Amino acid sequence: MAALSCCVPSAEAHDDSHRAGKLTEANECYLRSPDRLSAGLDSVEFGLSGVALSGGRATQRKRHRLGISINAIVAQPIWKSIHSSYLSQSSLFLHLPSFFSYQTKNLSTITMNLKMAAKSLSIVQPVAVPQGTPNFEAKRASLLQAFAEKIPVEYLLPQELIDNPPVDVSGVPTTCGILTAEEIDITETYDAVGLAEAIATKKYTAVAVATAFSKRAIISHQLTCCLTQWFMDLAIEQAKKLDAYLAEHGKTVGPLHGVPISIKDHMPIAGTYSSLGCYLTIVKDDTDSHMIAILRAMGAVFYCKTNQPQTLMHLESDSLWGRVLNPFNIHLSAGGSTGGEAALIAMKGSVLGVGTDIGGSIRAPAAFCGIYGFKPTSPLLPMKGFLATPSAAELNILCSTGPMCRSLRDMDLFMNSVLAAKPYLADPKVVPFPWTGLKTPMNRRLKIGIISNDGFIKPQPPVKRAISWARELLSDPKHADLVEVKEFKPFGAAESWTKIRKMYWPDGGQASRGAIQATGEPLHPLSEWIWKDEAPKGMHNAQDVIMARRERDDFRCDFAESWNLQDVDVILGPAFIGPASAHNTAFYWTYTSLYNFVDYPGVVVPTPIKAKAAEEYESGYVPLSDACKHVKELWEGSNFDGAPIDLQLVARKYHDNELFSALTVLKDILSLP
């Protein structure tokens, strides 16, 4: 009887061989049938112990595993036994180390490297998304299973960690043992500018960088549910071409050569899928959207798409893929609608991402997660080909697209790269705009207005601390030649909040609600909240739209006049009513949506301030409104400990370069990264 002996190295040997990069896509093999094991042999012997078997339905919360010891067993009987008694009709996956030696009848040896795929993927979800109809849940399970089957098992976190995660998961990728020392260095030491330089000088290959960020992204996803798609294979393929080009020509293809960029789910990338956060809207992308085409031509590498809210239109990124968690406190939201990006970047699973913003959807999640986010004046960057553009809301309020990242110079790199491609030539909506960014000179003292509150909602305690911190630094006499600090009172915050909510949904939300419910998908709490608010307003007719736009334009003139009378160049204030919100409670967007209403550029910047569990409102607090009172109740009902605080810097419309000039002044004073 011929035998097949399987020689399995120790766990340490497996780790070393894996870190040496010996696993490749070409060596991938899935054991799905007894034929793949026996290869025509009469019987097969294993010399193994502690082999882990897994199978069963793909779920987000539970992964079935069975640990057994096997000695001198026959392949077909054991396969049939396990298949029938444990896995039913599921495929069998043997989770083994990488290197196997098979001896056949003629005693020749075949050596194979196997990369096993996960059958299911467990994700931390302390607050589950609502369940839909059985038919919808079956479709959803199919999507989740397809995602899981792309993930090599060596990239899975221990089930014990998923079941009992720390409140702050931001450090797990560094300590979990999945990343090599080099991969940790690549993902933690460099910003996008630094990575581009390291690749151009051949310190790292584009393949090494793509591998590092792909691995860290899937680790981050298991902890925060930040992804909708993960396509490491496409990233490696693209990176190999870039490395070959650099080797042959001795130069890069562009300023983003080899830089991995993560992309919000509704931005089409050829060969992937896009959606608006609900099942009915999922479509296959045959071509790149305009922004993606520009970034690809500049050398960017795409490796994942990120989670967003149902319909995109609220500040919590919970969709059929699950709920995105804040890396610094998983009981808090990562924000929306670009919350997946924010969480991924904060986890250092991305160095640079692209978001959209029509009410705060870049700035709020960036602030929730303590990173940079820039909303340009609306017509500066291209959105041709994005799903949901133009949306019904854009009858009245224009959307912006922009970068999210961890350094000032990365925002500048992004803007320089995209605008250098002259996107206005292919998209008439885009305005020709010469970009000077961080090189814009500031030839006079910067007049900066500080916002303590917007006259409608007082910010929660840690945001007040951050404002005080910034004011104290900016008011230091040693900076008197650089900045003049003033108090600033925003015009019409309550009025703009009332008007913009009406203008977002000129159809009363009927189309979006219908698209969700058509498949049996449940309405998520914040989706329900929005439509309860908007349904009474009903469908707008032409006269309603005309009047709303007239009121908007009148407001914009009044806002500009108020700004001019207060005589400031830029304003610095809260990015949100508080730190990251507790799940399902992101009700008030007033500190971001105001600047969408007037279409002013805004950037959120990180501070060293973190929320503390024991913080309280000041004695003698008097609410400015019912909303203000509710915000205090939200603070007292949750634990925000550890949540980062960003502040928001805003300039006049089309003063985007001046905004970046102001950032160069604030960089040293506030020690901005």
Outline where the language-model segments fall.
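Acidic-enriched catalytic cores of C-N bond-cleaving enzymes acting on peptides and small amides
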Residues: A117-T175, A393-E394, R406-P434, L438-P441, ...
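An N-terminal boundary/leader segment
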Residues: C6-C7, L48, L92-A244, E472, ...
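Short glycine/serine-rich loop/turn segments
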Residues: P255-T401, I451-N453, P506, I571-Y588, ...
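N-terminal, positively charged, Ser/Thr/Ala/Gly-biased leader segments
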Residues: K203, S220-L280
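Structural helix-boundary/capping segments
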Residues: I219, A293, A297, A346-I451, ...
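Intrinsic-disorder-associated, low-complexity terminal segments enriched in Asp/Asn/His/Tyr and depleted
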Residues: D16-H18, Y30, D35, D42, ...
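Serine-dependent amide/ester hydrolase catalytic core
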Residues: V193-A200, S214, S452-P459, Q510-G620, ...
